């Protein structure tokens, strides 16, 4: 793990905290190309009334618009929580090169925990995966958010 991985995960954590402040499930994401953040996002499913507006999806959409290409070759996606099946599929379609995530998602993590979509033999594209980056901080943001709602 490089120092830049920590830096970019901290940026994703900032996005997660923004989501929490807005009453959204606190997941944040940043998409990086050649060491530069090209998009940043947080969950906004409630705000936008859009079940697909997960942090990863929003970051991927914004990055594609920014660079003018649906293929995000050579990019790294930093996410505070392990992506779901929808988001893992979007990474494959967008050709994200690398996924770095914080904490595991026990109720639907589709990269390592519940499913391994990115490793499925039928998938014709491979995403490098690094997990556990700032995992405790990422998990704490989620735990604090849900503790306040119970």
What are these model-predicted stretches?
Residues 2, 45-46:
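A short, polar/acidic, helix/strand-boundary loop motif
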Residues 27-35:
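Short beta-strand scaffold segments in enzyme catalytic cores
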Residues 33-34, 61, 73:
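A cytosolic small-molecule/anion-sensing beta-strand core signal
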Residues 47-58:
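A short, polar/charged loop-to-alpha-helix boundary motif
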């Amino acid at each position: 793990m490089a120092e830049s991985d920590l830096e970019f995960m901290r940026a994703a954590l900032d996005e997660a905290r923004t989501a929490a402040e807005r009453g959204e499930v606190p997941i944040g994401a940043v998409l990086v190309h050649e060491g530069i953040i090209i998009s940043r996002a947080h969950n906004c499913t409630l705000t936008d009334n859009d079940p697909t507006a997960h942090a990863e999806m929003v970051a991927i959409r914004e990055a594609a618009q920014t660079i003018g290409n649906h293929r995000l070759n050579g990019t790294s996606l930093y996410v505070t929580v392990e992506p779901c099946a929808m988001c893992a599929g979007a990474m494959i379609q967008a050709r994200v090169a690398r996924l770095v995530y914080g904490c595991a998602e026990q109720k639907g993590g589709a990269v390592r925990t519940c499913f391994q979509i990115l490793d499925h033999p039928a998938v014709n594209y491979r995403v490098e995966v690094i997990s556990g980056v700032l995992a405790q901080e990422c998990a704490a943001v989620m735990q604090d958010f849900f503790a306040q709602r119970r």
